[in-house]
Amino acid sequence: MLIVADENIPLLDAFFQGFGEIRRYPGRSLDAASVKDADILLVRSVTKVDRQLLEGSRVRFVGTCTIGTDHLDLDYFAEAGIHWSSAPGCNARGVVDYVLGSLLTLAELDGVALPERVYGVVGAGEVGGRLVRVLHGLGWKVLVCDPLRQAAEGGDYVSLETILQQCDVISLHTPLQRGGQHPTWHLLGQAQLAQLRPGAWLVNASRGPVVDNVALRELLLDREDVHAVLDVWEGEPQVDLQLADLCTLATPHIAGYSLDGRQRGTARIYQALCRFLGVNEQVRLAELLPKPPLAQIELDASTDLSWALATLCRAVYDPRRDDADFRRSLSDDPQQQRAAFDQLRKQYPPRREIEGLAVRLHGEAPQLAQLVSALGGVLV
């Protein structure tokens, strides 16, 4: 059996060497010739997998180590009898850590208290739903917009217009849909961006085209009160340099790039392939994940809640480092820019998640205990 895989997928040998030969390629350069003789294709979001890539090949299973599937032509898969699997939720915790780290940075810049802001989460799937639970656990006011879940479940959801008009912070976590009843391509265009409240913060860690990048650039040129945090870009790996300069935080699509999340994504498609082939799983992710470098954090019962929040979040991740690395890589040469974008992702340093972080409290501190629990830490 021949497996063709994106070279940036972690733990390929550990999970898949038992199935046959593995050939690695840069994800953006995968073409029909590369996959012609493959039985299994393993990709990330940078590879468009459609009829043009697969027609005439032997591929019968496609696995993507991502939450999103907008790069997969699922209609063609159905027509051609190709089985597929994604990795829903694999990097959700990493994205939540990214958002929390970004909020801490913006709060320090603006001199505001995070508990006093109103938060709007657009898209309450694996990532957005987890973010909502964390924010609720912290006791912060959260409004949620998700028309698909609202139609299916009912519940306390609000419209996008309500989010824009009432929320100080808006975090986007929708898939990219160009058609259908609820398209998300340019979900925030010129008209929607114009409705942002004074001093609003906008975070996009979903897909670049969910926000009209040209309209956002024009807004930021006109409104210095608005902060934008972008991890995803229209046309990436090419980046609008002026927009990047106007963003308060700018990063190269690494919000979900925690070590745990990336390896979890590989494990998910391995499990799906085992089911497809009807074989038992022989490899367990828990046996492959290294121990976190930070074993435990200790807090005194008198610790200020804001200080504790910042300390716990930044103990595992601080987006300012990635922002600085990204800005140093920006170039007026388009080819150099694209290469630098992908290189930052390929060589991304190990980053762990806050979930499961051991925290010891010295003394009775119910509010601190609640904060630790909300963040996903473990009291020891």
From Swiss-Prot:
Catalytic machinery residues: R207, E236, H253 (proton donor)
Catalysed reactions, as listed in the record: 4-phospho-D-erythronate + NAD(+) = (R)-3-hydroxy-2-oxo-4-phosphooxybutanoate + NADH + H(+)
GO terms assigned for molecular function: 4-phosphoerythronate dehydrogenase activity; NAD binding; protein dimerization activity
Compartment(s) where it occurs, according to its Swiss-Prot or TrEMBL record: Cytoplasm
CC terms in the record's Gene Ontology section: cytosol
Gene Ontology BP annotations: 'de novo' pyridoxal 5'-phosphate biosynthetic process; pyridoxine biosynthetic process
InterPro entries in the record: D-isomer_2_OHA_DH_cat_dom (IPR006139), D-isomer_DH_CS (IPR029753), D-isomer_DH_NAD-bd (IPR006140), Erythronate-4-P_DHase (IPR020921), Erythronate-4-P_DHase_dimer (IPR024531), NAD(P)-bd_dom_sf (IPR036291), PdxB_dimer_sf (IPR038251)
A family per Pfam: 2-Hacid_dh
HAMAP family xrefs: PdxB
Protein family: Belongs to the D-isomer specific 2-hydroxyacid dehydrogenase family. PdxB subfamily.
PANTHER family given in the database record: FORMATE DEHYDROGENASE 1 (PTHR42938:SF9)
Name of the protein in question: Erythronate-4-phosphate dehydrogenase
